[in-house]
Design a protein with these regions (language model features):
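N-terminal localization/anchoring segments of enzymes in phospholipid and broader phosphate metabolism
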Residues: 1-302
């Protein structure tokens, strides 16, 4: 079951809300159907003995050292960065009061781990939840569920450009983005008590969109390890066309403007080459460029 909650009661947004709800439901259902047929992501508790032992050791040696549980004070608002988290409820005994903690999933850690010699992998969220007793050895696990926060990318320009250089402007803008309002909250639970708990803990607005299902962060499926796929299942890589001359791009665009078509044309032979020439040209005083987003190993950033 999937629950989609909207606090904003505005007739003008009804059509938009319905479209978002339908798309989200289709996305989750199609992934469940696809994974049921192909078994690309297997629950940790369904692994056979040898695979389960390897996964457990991988958790202890590679995953556990980078996890840091943080205590939650229910009387205070949680101001978390955009990302994926686990909320864990524990207690020492039945007579002991309940303790609430969250675990941030580091961005640098793989969301899916391929099992050696197998054509499937395990989810990092499932792996961590399966090993919570190892993390909280002196406490009993009551419940746990993941959630993902997405904050608005919009910032309001209140920067004094005359007093801050470009680097300081960027740093200040990025910090402001991390404090911007939460646009979307994905909750990996359909329990009303869990949804209510997060709604009380996080600084949500009336127009924050809340998704509740058994899955969160399906966008991370794009990072499924390639080794679990057979060659016939892998997408054919498109080779960009090299249409720009091998000579200087500076000389080429002196005669006329040129519109580059990506990814049809080679990005390396157009944009990257243009910036490299600009960096080496002694007549170029400065390079100013606005990037919406970059790849993990961006040549432009390098």
């Amino acid at each position: 079951p999937i629950e989609l909650t909207f606090d904003l009661d505005d007739d003008a947004l009804d059509e938009f809300k319905d479209a978002i709800a339908n798309f989200y439901q289709k996305m989750v259902k199609r992934w469940h159907k696809f994974n049921k047929n192909y078994q690309l992501v297997v629950p940790v508790d369904e692994l056979k003995k040898n695979s389960a032992k390897w996964v457990e050791q991988t958790f202890k040696s590679e995953v556990f050292p980078v996890l840091q549980p943080m205590n939650v004070d229910k009387s205070k608002t949680l101001n978390l960065h955009p990302g994926t988290y686990l909320l864990v409820r524990t207690r020492k005994s039945k007579s002991d009061s309940e303790k609430l903690q969250y675990i941030e999933i580091p961005k640098g850690i793989d969301r899916y781990i391929a099992v050696p010699g197998k054509k499937y992998c395990v989810s990092i969220l499932d792996l961590i939840q399966d090993n919570l007793e190892f993390m909280f050895k002196d406490r009993k696990i009551i419940s746990s569920f993941p959630f993902t926060i997405l904050r608005s990318a919009q910032v309001f320009d209140q920067i004094d450009r005359e007093q801050l250089d470009a680097y300081q402007q960027i740093v200040k803008t990025l910090k402001e983005r991390e404090r911007s309002w939460i646009t979307t909250l994905e909750i990996g639970s359909t329990e009303k008590s869990d949804i209510k708990l997060l709604r009380n803990l996080l600084p949500l607005r009336s127009d924050t969109i809340i998704f509740a299902s058994k899955e969160v962060g399906l966008a991370s499926l794009k990072s499924l390890p390639g080794e679990i796929f057979s060659d016939k299942d892998k997408c054919r890589k498109m080779k960009p066309v090299k249409t720009f001359p091998k000579s200087s791009i500076f000389e080429y665009i002196k005669s006329k403007d040129r519109l580059a078509f990506h990814p049809y044309e080679s990005y390396d032979q157009t944009m990257v080459k243009f910036l490299e020439e600009a960096a080496d040209d002694p007549n170029v005083v400065s390079i100013k460029i606005s990037l919406y987003r970059v790849a993990n190993n961006s040549k432009i950033v390098q």
